[in-house]
Amino acid sequence: MAPYHIRKYQESDRKSVVGLLSGGMAEHAPATFRRLLKLPRTLILLLGGALALLLVSGSWILALVFSLSLLPALWFLAKKPWTRYVDIALRTDMSDITKSYLSECGSCFWVAESEEKVVGTVGALPVDDPTLREKRLQLFHLSVDNEHRGQGIAKALVRTVLQFARDQGYSEVVLDTSNIQLSAMGLYQSLGFKKTGQSFFHVWARLVDLHTVHFIYHLPSAQAGRL
């Protein structure tokens, strides 16, 4: 197991960071596709459509071809929420990481580096909502390279955000993940995050029953000590 350290983002990291974001999101497409295939409406479309065609045409081959021809479209639907997420990120906060995360003292972006390679990322931005009673920080873009998982890097990155939040005087840390990302949800819950609800990120997510799951971590007082 190669050693790693966590440091603030530098502009020279951009290509690696964007690669981790894109690759990490693409990894979830197969699980989304499998979930999509199990949905009742998908089964009705695949099986019901094939059966109707069989009854009309009397051809098993034609019915089978019909079902198989739908699979590429379903795969496209399964990938779309993730590519959409990356596209939005690269047009918004990730378009200029330094400006978005490192221009103010209440936000930051970190990378985990191992053997001079960026193998993990996480960012944190203040939640701009005047109706909130507590000062809240939001965690973004937690990602770890597939070859470096199982080393505690993700947990260390989350703890870095939590300690930053404490140091900056935040009362709460929030984050969003998806119902597909079971290991991520397990990680957050093991660190003390509590689920607060779920929603749909976009119409594409609704089509494949991909829920955004919301979590919150209530920070203890600064006197309670470091994490």
UniProtKB/Swiss-Prot annotation:
Keywords: Acetylation, Acyltransferase, Endoplasmic reticulum, Membrane, Signal-anchor, Transferase, Transmembrane, Transmembrane helix
Residues in the Lumenal compartment per record: 64-227
PTM description: Acetylation on Lys-99 modulates enzymatic activity.
Enzyme class: transferase
Membrane topology, record value: Single-pass type II membrane protein
Domain of life: Eukaryota
Transmembrane segments: 43-63
Keyword Thylakoid: no
Name of the protein: N-acetyltransferase 8B
InterPro entries: Acyl_CoA_acyltransferase, GNAT_dom, NAT_camello-type
Induction (free text): Up-regulated by ceramides. Up-regulated in the brain of Alzheimer's disease patients.
UniProt domain N-acetyltransferase: residue ranges: 61-214
Lineage: Eukaryota, Metazoa, Chordata, Craniata, Vertebrata
